[in-house]
Amino acid sequence: MTGAISSVKSEDLVKLYMSDEIKDKNELEGQNPDDLGNSDAQEQHSDYKPVNRFDASAVHHLSGMYQNWFLDYASYVILERAVPHIEDGLKPVQRRILHSMKRMDDGRYNKVANIVGHTMQFHPHGDASIGDALVQMGQKDLLIDTQGNWGNILTGDRAAAPRYIEARLSKFALDVVFNPKTTDWQLSYDGRNKEPITLPAKFPLLLAQGAEGIAVGLSSKVLPHNFNDLCDAAIHYLRGEDFAIYPDFPTGGAIDVSKYNDGQRGGALKVRAKIDKLDSKTLVITEIPYSKTTVSLIESITKAVE
């Protein structure tokens, strides 16, 4: 947006907003009311004042206005939609889903369509975004106990429709994620309800689940880690001992962490699928790289053969 503004000539901006001429206000006092319906008279009586030279202050004000708008929009997308909070490791839609499920919790499964409807009280971005986020959380098998066809992360098959599948909070989530006494609250988007600013999670969910989001001007990508490895790392940290921890993926695969750089910017990982040759015509794929599916892997093998 800034580049687009800078490409417009200053003279054109001045002409665009200040091209009309106006008479002195003293001359308007004696104007005949019948002339107000005349289009020529209306053009002469414009509220704009003539500008005979470049007005730098006006152009500066315009660019500043666009800069503020951009920052407001970028901040909204970063904080309210795309990037997880480091304290609980959750994006706003994930936090609102868990909060809604906690309010609904009675120990029994709820239809996903029902959960989505309740979450819309807190998340004003439509049912599709809520449903997709809920399925992704359910497939990670940590915070949500699922029932029904929730898709397959290995094959890429999608989950069944929300009216056919059910979910409830896992025992782990009930024990670790919620504590109303230590939760800071804020009003929901319409002011009718209260929602948590962050959840007082007692486990590093950001590292356990991983997160990926694309915002305005930045992106985040945190890879998932093994549950037991995180527990061991926490113990070493509390004891003041050195430790090393690396990502681990639910889809398996062989990993090269030589360029991981402790997960900092510029680090990289290599993950390879595990393929066994059964016979001259059959390959058995038992592990695949994270975020890939068997369908995409088979397609890449086919292209390599061709």
Enumerate the predicted regions with their spans.
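Ala/Thr-enriched low-complexity intrinsically disordered regions
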Residues: 2-4, 41
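Intrinsically disordered, low-complexity segments enriched in serine/proline and basic residues
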Residues: 6-13
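Catalytic phosphate-handling regions of large nucleic-acid enzymes and associated NTPases
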Residues: 13-266
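Gly/Lys-enriched N-terminal cap/neck module of very large, oligomeric protein machines
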Residues: 268-306
